[in-house]
């Protein structure tokens, strides 16, 4: 369907989630005969290059976002907002300069509004059609919709039925005319006949830490302190792809990063999973059919909203970072039984068929 078409896949570089959720998309492009080119930098590029070592790549730098140590991110984000706008303009100019050299037929951008061109089919993948922001939300939502309209297509990573996983973020009264749902995107798949099914879980707790500093490290320190007082073996995945050495602190194994299949097995072979309430993580949990203790990043509007949403749906246990209690969470079960959801559904195949039509 896409035989020989050179398609750039460019994830946003705020943490690793945007890169990891591009993995199943890249796999599907390869299956359809396309030639994906990876467009990323630093951690996201390290993740994608590890998953696809033979693929061509190009470095596309982005802005480094830092969160405040306090729970109030308003002033921190406001100070960085002008740099974010400049970054969008810079990456647009950079992309136009490299487009011809890369001999691209199309581009798929994960939340990078500057990675598009009027000269070739440009697709945006997102779950943030109607984003939550700490200030001027109605104005910024209009700006977001205007940016979405500049792409030929907008693929929404969520279930069609509201509230889905993203709730109001992806289900509004009126969706953009160029949008369609493609289901969840996750590099995870259910592990059949895992050791935990017959002999008990290998790990009591598997914690997957992610996101910008300093909040990533703050959560790491809280979890490590509490885990040392809980019997059993625990695993902490630090969300640091450049950290190659495995470390052991008492009953806790610490590793910088794990590829999808290994992480899926570890998560499936645990009594409890702990993670942020980032959207990519929620898609991974849905693909595995696992609940988790989710901890929103303090002051991160979207994660706090998703925490509130799923405290109500009963899919997950939700605790705030300043009141994490792992012992209590271990004794709690989520209200709603979960069934693994298939990632890379027929909806994605239909969207790729539409892309093939644009390329004719």
Task: Enumerate the language-model features and the residues they cover.
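Conserved nucleotide-sugar phosphate-binding/catalytic loop shared by glycosyltransferases and other
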Residues: 3-6, 13, 31-81, 253
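A short, glycine/small-residue-rich beta-strand->loop->alpha-helix junction that serves as a flexible
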Residues: 11-23, 215-217
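Short amphipathic alpha-helix
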Residues: 19-29, 44
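Donor-nucleotide binding loops and adjacent catalytic segments primarily
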Residues: 26, 169, 184-272
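Conserved nucleotide-sugar donor-binding subdomain of glycosyltransferases
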Residues: 73-116
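A nucleotide-sugar donor-handling region in carbohydrate enzymes
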Residues: 126, 131-137, 142-214, 239-242
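A donor-sugar binding/catalytic signature common to diverse glycosyltransferases
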Residues: 262-305
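C-terminal amphipathic helix plus adjacent low-complexity
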Residues: 329-360
């Amino acid at each position: 369907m896409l035989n020989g078409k050179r398609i750039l896949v460019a994830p946003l570089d705020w943490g690793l989630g945007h890169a990891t959720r591009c993995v199943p998309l890249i796999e599907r492009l390869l299956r359809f005969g396309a030639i994906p080119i990876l467009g990323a930098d630093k951690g996201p590029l390290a993740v994608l290059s590890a998953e696809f070592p033979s693929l061509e790549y190009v470095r596309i730098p982005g802005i480094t976002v830092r969160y405040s140590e306090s729970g109030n991110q308003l002033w921190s984000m406001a100070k960085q907002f002008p740099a974010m706008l400049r970054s969008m303009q810079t990456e647009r100019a950079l992309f136009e300069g490299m487009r011809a050299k890369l001999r691209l037929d199309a581009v798929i951008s994960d939340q990078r509004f500057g990675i598009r061109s009027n000269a070739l089919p440009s697709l945006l993948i997102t779950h943030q059609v109607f984003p939550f922001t700490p200030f001027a939300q109605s104005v910024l939502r209009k700006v977001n919709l205007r940016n979405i309209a500049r792409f030929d297509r907008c693929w929404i990573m969520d279930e069609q039925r509201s509230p889905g996983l993203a709730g109001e973020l992806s289900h509004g009264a009126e969706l953009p005319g160029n949008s369609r749902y493609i289901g969840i995107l996750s590099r995870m798949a259910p592990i059949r006949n895992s050791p935990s099914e017959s002999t008990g879980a290998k790990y009591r707790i598997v914690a997957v830490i992610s996101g910008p500093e300093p909040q990533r490290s703050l959560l790491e320190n809280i979890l490590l302190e509490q885990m040392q007082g809980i019997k059993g073996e625990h695993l902490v995945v630090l969300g640091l792809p450049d950290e190659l050495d495995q470390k052991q602190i008492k009953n806790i194994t610490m590793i910088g990063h794990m590829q999808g299949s290994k992480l899926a097995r570890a998560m499936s072979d645990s009594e409890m999973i702990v993670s942020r309430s980032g959207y990519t993580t929620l898609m991974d949990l849905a693909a595995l059919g696992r609940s988790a203790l989710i901890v929103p990043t303090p002051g991160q509007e979207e994660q706090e909203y998703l925490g509130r949403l799923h405290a109500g749906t009963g899919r997950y246990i939700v605790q705030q970072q300043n009141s994490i209690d792992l012992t209590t969470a271990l004794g709690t079960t989520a209200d709603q039984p979960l069934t693994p959801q298939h990632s890379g559904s027929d909806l994605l195949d239909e969207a790729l068929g539409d892309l093939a039509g644009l390329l004719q």
